Design a protein with these regions (language model features):
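Soluble cytosolic regulatory domains appended to membrane proteins
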Residues: 6-177, 181-190
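Transmembrane alpha-helices and immediately adjacent membrane-cytoplasm interface residues
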Residues: 1-3
Length: 190
């Protein structure tokens, strides 16, 4: 048959065609693809084309802490295990879950899980290392960048065995209107 008709090529679908097939499967009663699966697949196909500025949450202006830096890492001030401590009050000022740690020039370095940090300091009553609650975000400065380009930069790797930072597991859109995109924002689309 190949000699008469030629080799049969694999037919690849354009993304728009795949989306239409999924929509039709979603609506068909006899389809093996249920509505939830189809919606997840459609969202998955769409997510890489969205501009990064369409995802995540705006950051509260009070969610930024500028700290001195030594050897590329922020130097956290000494703090007391008290709700009245000035540094802890700064971390809590916005009431938001995440705080951006920047250098003295305002360049972002890390994001801190403010809720986890404050809970540990105030209720565990043991020495708390702020770095244990910090993540190194993927910093993006172009709000039009497709989300798919930033997603591929998300990963976990420890730079050294003593490095407690979780690296590249959140995206920080660093513009005049900063936004934070976490894994839960991305999973919420699926």
């Amino acid at each position: 048959l190949d000699a008469w008709l030629g080799k049969e090529a694999i037919q690849y679908f354009r993304e728009a065609d795949l989306k239409e097939i999924l929509r039709r499967h979603m609506l068909a009663e006899e389809s093996e693809v249920n509505r939830t699966e189809a919606i997840g697949a459609l969202n998955f196909l769409t997510i890489d084309d969205l501009p990064i500025e369409s995802e995540g949450v705006d950051l509260d202006p009070r969610s930024f802490l500028r700290l001195p830096v030594r050897n590329g890492m922020p130097v956290f001030p000494h703090f007391r295990e008290s709700p009245e401590d000035p540094f802890l009050r700064q971390v809590e000022a916005s009431g938001k879950a995440w705080v951006v740690i920047a250098d003295e020039a305002g360049e972002p370095l890390l994001i801190m899980d403010a809720d986890g940090f404050l809970r540990h300091v105030l209720f565990q009553r043991q020495r708390t290392d702020p770095l244990a609650f910090c993540h190194r975000p993927v910093v993006v400065r172009d709000p039009a960048m497709p989300l798919g380009e930033a997603i591929v930069r998300l990963r976990f790797h420890a730079e050294a065995s003593e490095d407690d930072l979780i690296d590249d597991d959140a995206i920080l859109l660093w513009t005049d209107a900063p936004r934070l995109i976490t894994g839960s924002d991305l999973l919420g689309r699926l």
